[in-house]
């Protein structure tokens, strides 16, 4: 797993990406929309904390169940935690901090919804004036994937159910597989609700840019 730091900012109407924290001192912070930390060192986190005057939670804190979907608002920042589903149905806890319109995302692994979101920002940079816009898109993109996974599982459950014969020994295996898939669907549904809760909390926070609350 590669450690990676990326800063996304606007320059002359285009999206720029930097991999150096020194960029913070060079760009106008109003142009900075997103700092993505993927498995970075404590030193990088500390430097960023001091520069932006934020607090980045430790892995253990983010992983605690009651923390994993929490939403905290102070007078100048928002902290939201949400678990992102991996292809193997494992959950990756991610922490988001927004301050002065800048989003900081903290995670420990590659997430395809993040790569997809970056493509969306490149394709339509003007639609992402702040970190709030980035966060909503990250959550929406993951929810789209989650919905696709549910659809796929539901199709599999349906076709497996059709193969059931009442007096067949194979049925036991099929039933176990169906039950396993149904449990996965529950986990994914939970995840979708979790993302929707974060978005609705963001909208209620009063810090949200007006164009997004429509």
For each predicted feature, which ranges?
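Peripheral, non-transmembrane regulatory/ligand-interaction domains of membrane transport proteins
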Residues: 1-213
């Amino acid at each position: 797993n590669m450690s990676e730091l990326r800063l996304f900012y606007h320059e002359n109407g285009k999206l720029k990406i930097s991999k150096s924290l020194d960029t913070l001192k060079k760009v106008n912070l109003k142009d900075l929309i997103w700092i993505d930390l993927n498995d970075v060192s404590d030193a990088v986190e500390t430097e960023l904390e001091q520069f932006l005057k934020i607090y980045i939670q430790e892995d253990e804190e983010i992983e605690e169940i009651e923390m994993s979907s929490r939403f905290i608002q102070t007078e100048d920042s928002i902290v939201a935690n949400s678990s992102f589903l991996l292809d193997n149905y494992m959950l990756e806890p991610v922490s988001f901090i927004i301050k002065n319109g800048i989003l900081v995302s903290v995670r420990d692994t590659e997430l395809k919804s993040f790569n997809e979101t970056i493509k969306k920002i490149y394709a339509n940079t003007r639609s992402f004036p702040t970190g709030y816009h980035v966060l909503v898109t990250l959550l929406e993109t993951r929810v789209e994937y989650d919905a696709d996974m549910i659809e796929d599982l539901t199709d599999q459950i349906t076709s497996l159910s059709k193969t059931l014969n009442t007096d067949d020994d194979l049925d036991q295996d099929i039933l176990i597989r169906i039950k396993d898939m149904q449990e996965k669907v529950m986990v994914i549904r939970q995840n979708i609700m979790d993302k929707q809760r974060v978005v609705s909390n963001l909208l209620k926070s009063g810090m949200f840019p007006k164009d997004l609350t429509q």
